[in-house]
From Swiss-Prot:
Main location: cytoplasm
UniProt name for this protein: Ribosomal RNA small subunit methyltransferase F
EC number, as in UniProt: 2.1.1.178
Catalytic activity: cytidine(1407) in 16S rRNA + S-adenosyl-L-methionine = 5-methylcytidine(1407) in 16S rRNA + S-adenosyl-L-homocysteine + H(+)
Family: Belongs to the class I-like SAM-binding methyltransferase superfamily. RsmB/NOP family.
Entry keyword set: Cytoplasm, Methyltransferase, RNA-binding, rRNA processing, S-adenosyl-L-methionine, Transferase
Annotated InterPro entries: Methyltr_RsmF_N, MeTrfase_RsmB-F_NOP2_cat, MeTrfase_RsmB-F_NOP2_dom, Nol1_Nop2_Fmu_2, Nop2p, RCMT, rRNA_ssu_MeTfrase_F, RsmB/NOL1/NOP2-like_CS
Gene name of the record: rsmF
Signal peptide (residue range): none
Organism (species): Escherichia coli O81 (strain ED1a)
Length: 479
């Protein structure tokens, strides 16, 4: 594999020599950093099983190597890497897999270790959505996830990825993560804090990642991380699990942050060792039981993961003074909800008791029941999934609801050819050789729902959202 030239500040190299265990080779570290990163994907088990995915993609000649800590994760090699971007494959467009770096699958593996089955989870720094979607798959779309993102520009990307993967149990917020400890104390069974960091572990992906690196900036970042983990720990219920992770390598932003939390709340913090998380985990194990993953150990990005339990309650933070504002939605009455459910079922949309109908003007939404306890405590950017808009003749079903709720076995499902599916993703109407009978048509490809069309004569009118429309070469190879 070709090498690339990585910029290493001298002070960084000195710090790494001190931080690296004697069992590891510093020369191996430097060599690993200069090898391009292996690509990896995670199968979205909300949409397909690993076995079915492997069978579906077998004709492509992809080499898929299992990732030890994530049974649905694979390193991927393709002979035609330059011919078609992974993101333009049919399987990616329909949400069957997520392009995710292997080491970033570790925190969620740690969150659900030992059979942990949390019902209300927070992802404090969620964009672009790799870990939120991984959490949702582990929860099988049950319970509720609060996915927060501080950067306004990244919230849209977060929602797009959640929607593409067919996820229905997520509420999005846009806050500084330091507010949650005061705003929603002891409300979560599990919390993932994949903290903003100096990014020392990502040099294999970005050779210039350390251009602005300095020991002083590490200390400033660590100060913010301490505030974030303190807030997250307050938001965690007693008995709950907190996973703290970064994609950096210095101890200041990793072990020291976790040790600070234990020193601050000595009777409430229990470190949960990760040496048995997967075969070979002990190669990265620290004396505290954390995983400090240098890139040469597993040939992946540098990463850090710690898992801890909150053993008892801690003194509450001052109640926040901000006002959340009026919640603009109201629950739909049972009788009307039954009518809506029946109408939705006629086009193949079904949901279970984990979701409840709410209304805002002419909009119908499905919110995860587990998030209702947070209403009035935080302001949501987006909650659950938009099911439909009402109009004089009935309902205008929404694309994200189709992707999350539709069954491809519905009587009105219509399977597209590869060429027709590609036209669909380009936002164009489809003219099948034999048009379906129904007026509302659930269009599928590879037996996966990809949208809802109106039949007008022999034409299927495209309803694919404009912001998702794709240009350029797609999976049939035609531009």
């Amino acid at each position: 594999m070709a090498q690339h030239t990585v910029y290493f500040p001298d002070a960084f190299l000195t710090q790494m020599r001190e931080a690296m265990p004697s069992t590891l080779s510093f020369d191996d570290f430097l060599a690993a950093c200069q090898r391009p990163l292996r690509r990896s994907i995670r199968v979205n088990t909300l949409k397909t099983s690993v076995a079915d995915f492997l069978q579906l993609t077998a004709p492509y000649g992809w080499t898929l190597t299992p990732i030890p800590w994530c049974e649905e994760g694979f390193w991927i090699e393709r002979d035609n890497e330059d011919a078609l971007p992974l993101g333009s494959t049919a399987e990616h467009l329909s949400g069957l897999f997520y392009i995710q770096e292997a080491s970033s699958m570790l925190p969620v593996a740690a969150l659900f270790a030992d059979g942990n089955a949390p019902q209300r989870v927070m992802d404090v720094a969620a964009a672009p959505g790799s870990k939120t979607t991984q959490i949702a798959a582990r929860m099988n779309n049950e319970g509720a996830i609060l996915a927060n993102e501080f950067s306004a520009s990244r919230v849209k990307v977060l929602h797009a990825n959640i929607s593409r993967c067919g996820i229905s149990n997520v509420a999005l917020t846009h806050f500084d993560g330091r507010v949650f400890g005061a705003a929603v104390p002891e409300m979560f069974d599990a919390i993932l804090l994949d903290a903003p960091c100096s990014g020392e572990g990502v040099v294999r992906k970005d050779p210039d990642a350390l251009k602005n690196w300095s020991p002083e900036s590490n200390q400033e970042i660590a100060a913010t991380q301490r505030e974030l983990i303190d807030s997250a720990f307050h938001a965690l219920r007693p008995g709950g699990t907190l996973v703290y992770s970064t994609c950096t390598l210095n101890r200041e932003e990793n072990e020291a942050v976790c040790l600070w939390l234990k020193e601050t709340y000595p009777d409430a913090v229990e470190f949960l060792p990760l040496g048995d998380l997967f075969p070979g985990a002990n190669k990265a194990l620290t004396e505290e039981g954390f995983l400090h993953v240098f890139p040469q150990i597993y040939d992946c990005e540098g990463f850090f993961v710690a898992r801890l339990r909150k053993t008892q309650a801690i003194p509450a933070l001052p109640t926040p003074k901000y006002k959340v504002g009026n919640f603009p939605f109201s629950p739909v009455k049972d009788r009307e909800a039954g009518q809506i459910r029946q109408a939705a079922a006629s086009v193949g949309l079904n949901w279970d008791e984990n979701l409840r109908l709410w209304q805002r003007d002419k909009e119908l939404w499905l919110f995860p029941v587990g998030i209702e306890a947070l209403i009035g405590k935080v302001r949501f950017s987006r909650l659950g999934i938009k099911l439909a808009e009402t109009h004089n003749k009935g309902y205008r079903w929404q694309h994200e609801a189709v992707i999350a709720l539709a069954s491809p076995d519905n009587v009105n499902a219509f399977e597209l050819t590869p060429q027709e599916a590609e036209e669909w993703y380009r936002g164009r109407d489809v003219y099948p050789q034999a048009a379906p009978v129904a007026d509302d048509v659930l269009v599928t490809f590879q037996h996966q729902p990809i949208g809802l069309a109106k039949r007008i004569g022999s034409r299927l009118k495209n309803s694919y959202p404009r912001e998702l429309v794709r240009d350029g070469k797609l999976f049939t190879g035609n531009a």
